[in-house]
């Protein structure tokens, strides 16, 4: 019985290692094609615009509502915690760091993953079923690019909406006027925050698309998407926090 258990663990470990290795090869192939100028043509551009409409423009009303609700609640919690620790003067820095660097990319990619991961998986399954893997340039690459661009755009939109809706929390909790709130937020905002937002959202978006496409092409169940996506996202989030701490320590 013990030997059977050990064999199962070994088989599972080898299977996971092979799966992640093949996914890395698939990722490398996609990156090489994205960087190849020959990939881009009129047909590919048409598919890209269609995918962008489906993954970003079409869902903006729902996303704005979610961002406004979460913005008021989350920033309210940040302000309450700041008040408890007498950090009112650093409210702007806390809001900018928490919203732009951490919360906006994560919530945006979770929204994209929840709405479109299964759809991407089904599309890839149909491509596999129809034997149309050769249409990498016109189907797979546009889907990856559209997911990346949509995640970046929604992250920026989410940050703006959260910061604007967060003023309500600041006003009711601290009684802060709009001019002071704008000064604290904009004085805390810098190029590094925008850079981190764009890098994180682009990485997160590419992970969602590549994992869903890979599982679809290999006819894996959609539930495999979520587990792989969450593991990779939280690893990147932890790594980014570590890099930020090291960077701040060096400065």
Residue locations for each model-derived region?
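Short cytoplasmic-facing helical segments at TM-TM junctions of multi-pass membrane proteins
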Residues: 122-144
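Selective transmembrane-helix segments that form parts of the transport pathway or gating/packing helices
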Residues: 56, 60, 64, 139-163, ...
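Juxtamembrane boundary at the C-terminal end of a transmembrane helix
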Residues: 239-251
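Short, membrane-interfacial amphipathic segments enriched in basic
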Residues: 2-48
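Membrane-interfacial helix-loop-helix connectors in multipass membrane proteins
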Residues: 77-100, 148, 157-202, 211-225, ...
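Active-site cofactor/substrate anionic-group-binding motifs, chiefly glycine-
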Residues: 55-107
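Hydrophobic alpha-helical transmembrane segments of multi-pass membrane transport proteins
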Residues: 92-128
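Membrane-interface helix starts
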Residues: 39-48, 53-65, 228-231
């Amino acid at each position: 019985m013990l030997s059977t258990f050990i064999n199962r663990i070994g088989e599972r470990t080898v299977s996971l290692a092979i799966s992640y290795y093949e996914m890395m090869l698939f990722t490398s192939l996609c990156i090489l094609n994205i960087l190849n100028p020959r990939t881009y043509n009129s047909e590919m551009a048409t598919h890209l615009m269609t995918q962008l409409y489906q993954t970003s423009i079409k869902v903006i009303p729902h996303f704005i509502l979610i961002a406004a609700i979460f913005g008021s609640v989350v920033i309210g919690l940040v302000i309450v915690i700041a008040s408890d620790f007498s950090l009112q003067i650093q409210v702007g820095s806390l809001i900018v760091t928490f919203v732009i660097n951490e919360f906006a990319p994560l919530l945006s990619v979770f929204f994209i993953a929840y709405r479109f991961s299964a759809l991407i998986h089904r599309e890839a399954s149909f491509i596999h079923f129809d034997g149309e893997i050769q249409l990498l340039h016109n189907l797979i690459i546009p889907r990856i690019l559209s997911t990346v661009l949509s995640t970046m755009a929604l992250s920026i939109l989410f940050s703006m909406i959260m910061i604007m809706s967060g003023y309500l929390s600041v006003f009711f909790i601290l009684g802060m006027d709009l001019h002071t709130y704008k000064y604290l937020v904009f004085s805390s905002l810098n190029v590094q925050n925008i850079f981190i937002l764009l890098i994180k959202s682009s990485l997160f978006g590419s992970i969602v698309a590549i994992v869903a496409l890979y599982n679809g092409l290999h006819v894996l169940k959609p539930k495999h998407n979520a587990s792989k996506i969450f593991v990779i996202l939280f690893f990147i989030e932890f790594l980014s926090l570590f890099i930020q701490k090291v960077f701040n320590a060096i400065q």
